[in-house]
Amino acid sequence: MQRYIQRLEEGHDLSPEEAEDAVGKILSTAQDEEIGRFLLALRAKGEKPEEIAGFVRGMKKAGKTIRPKTSFRLVDTCGTGGDGLNTINISTAAAIVTAAAGVPVAKHGNRAATSMSGSSDVLDALGIKTDLEPEAVRQTIEEIGIGFMFAPVFHPAMKRVAGVRKKLGVRTVFNILGPLTNPAGTKGQVIGVFDKKLCEPIAYALAELGTEHALVVHGDGMDEITNTGETYVAELKDGKVSTYTLTPEALGMLRANPEDIKGGTPKENARDLLCIFKGQKGPKRDIVVMNAAAALYVGGIVGSIRQAIPIAEDAIDSGKVMVKFNQFKTFTSEFYRQKNKESLSGKSMSMRSRTSILSPASGERV
């Protein structure tokens, strides 16, 4: 670690292999002081796409992965968070709309970091179980076309850096790695970032990682495609990165005010999402539709985001989204019940085992 820290403090870039090795050490043997110095030195130098790709490979190597079999390109809708705008859970709602429209989704997420409601928080409030084991998530994706991968389950080693990150009190490379480390190996991604300057580096990092089609977006201060102003997009397609801006009008949508898409607590956001799923129109539905359309585009079923807008709208208005939501809720609840049943059965077996090795006559162990 000391060699890597010195290189960074001198302003030198790490090779992808060095970055991968460094994050492996951070997640296993590095001391807190070394981790802190490394993260601050990297932050001061600035992360290069090749370094980001190396960090992602290292994190995936240290974590748990799944490989669901799907008929269409598997996609994820995930943001870095950290925009501080406290909107409704746009990418989470968009994931369910996307799956209802026929493109399989492996949603990667966590609890709230800076907002009141993270993806896991709102799904829990909706009655969808989020902390399933990897095999259960794989089956969920294959059976109903959507699954949720709770970051602490798939990346348990991240606990090692939680204290250091909190103590540093500044954004580090780990603030951008979450959306890039999808455990299902998604080849299509819509990634929202909290800073416009991150769009291109992350798109180039995704190219290094073999992603087929991705949109890295920053819209009017938020880590989403927005209907409140312009969205800056870095698009990775066919191995090339291009940049452009989107407006709601260009997608045939109405422009909204930031207040129109504000969120609240997980329960409040859950109510908003259910209203959208049931067909209620308005700015909150519009922004979900726009982001779902982007996911359908990277999923490969249409040639542009605009072409996907009516597909996303029809998924809601036809009732397909509510059907998919109910499937998601039922399927994850069943896995959760099985998990608890097996856990209770294991405890019962353990108690019987302890009882069986006692002498019936004396109560002494034999």
Curated annotation (Swiss-Prot):
Q: Which GO terms describe its biological process?
A: L-tryptophan biosynthetic process
Q: Which family does it belong to?
A: Belongs to the anthranilate phosphoribosyltransferase family.
Keyword DNA repair among UniProt keywords:
no
Q: Where does anthranilate 1 bind?
A: G79, N110
The ranges of region (Disordered) come to 342-366
One family name in Pfam for this protein: Glycos_transf_3
List keywords of the entry alphabetically. Amino-acid biosynthesis, Aromatic amino acid biosynthesis, Glycosyltransferase, Magnesium, Metal-binding, Transferase, Tryptophan biosynthesis
Q: Does the keyword Nucleotide-binding apply?
A: no
Name by which UniProt lists this protein: Anthranilate phosphoribosyltransferase
Q: What does this protein do?
A: Catalyzes the transfer of the phosphoribosyl group of 5-phosphorylribose-1-pyrophosphate (PRPP) to anthranilate to yield N-(5'-phosphoribosyl)-anthranilate (PRA).
Cofactor comment text: Binds 2 magnesium ions per monomer.
Query: What cofactors does this protein use?
Result: Mg(2+)
